[in-house]
Amino acid sequence: MLDARNVTAIVVTYNRLPLLKQCLAALRAQTVQGFTVLLVDNASTDGTADYIKTLAMPGLVCRNPGENLGGAGGFAYGIRAAVELGCEAVWIMDDDTLPEPDALAALLAADAAHGDGCGWLSSRALAPDGTDQPMNLQRKTMYRDIDGFDAAEVPAVMASFVSLFLRTEA
């Protein structure tokens, strides 16, 4: 099983400090610890850099590319930086993602069970009211019918930058 110490959570932010604070608190509350948090601050102007300097968060690495690369650009930048740090897997999320305390533990368990047979893993994304968010909700495809699939793990054909987990060897 992949050890959490070999995982880097990548969080991309731009001028959303209140959301970032909640995201970082949720990462600190994970039941599995020891992973690195790589924060990509896309040149925020809302006090994010000053706030980060005040944090005493073990495993936090902050990178600022000096410009707003956008979401996808920030994730590409973060993945390259995480690979340079030597991690074996990345856990990608926007700054408004609030992972449940057992989210990383569940992803690590799913990776141990299916890691060789899947390209990536993704968490279920819920709105604040508990309803499913459409960005990670799986749909029928011509390749697979998932009607009635009621399990903790669902075959997936798409995901968003809301709790996307993949091995760096991919």
List where the protein language model places each region.
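Cell-envelope/extracellular polymer assembly enzymes that use nucleotide-activated donors
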Residues: N6-T8, T36
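Short, acidic, metal-binding catalytic loop of nucleotide-sugar glycosyltransferases
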Residues: A25-G34
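A conserved acidic beta->alpha catalytic loop
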Residues: A26, D41-D50
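Short beta-strand/loop segment that forms part of the nucleotide-sugar
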Residues: F35-A43, R63-P65
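Conserved donor nucleotide-binding strand/loop of the catalytic core
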Residues: K53-G73, A81, L85
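Short beta-strand-to-loop acidic/aromatic patch adjacent to the donor-nucleotide binding site
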Residues: C87-D96
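Conserved donor NDP-sugar-binding/catalytic core segment of glycosyltransferases
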Residues: D102-P134
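A recurrent flexible, glycine/aromatic-enriched loop bordering the glycosyltransferase active site
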Residues: I146-L166
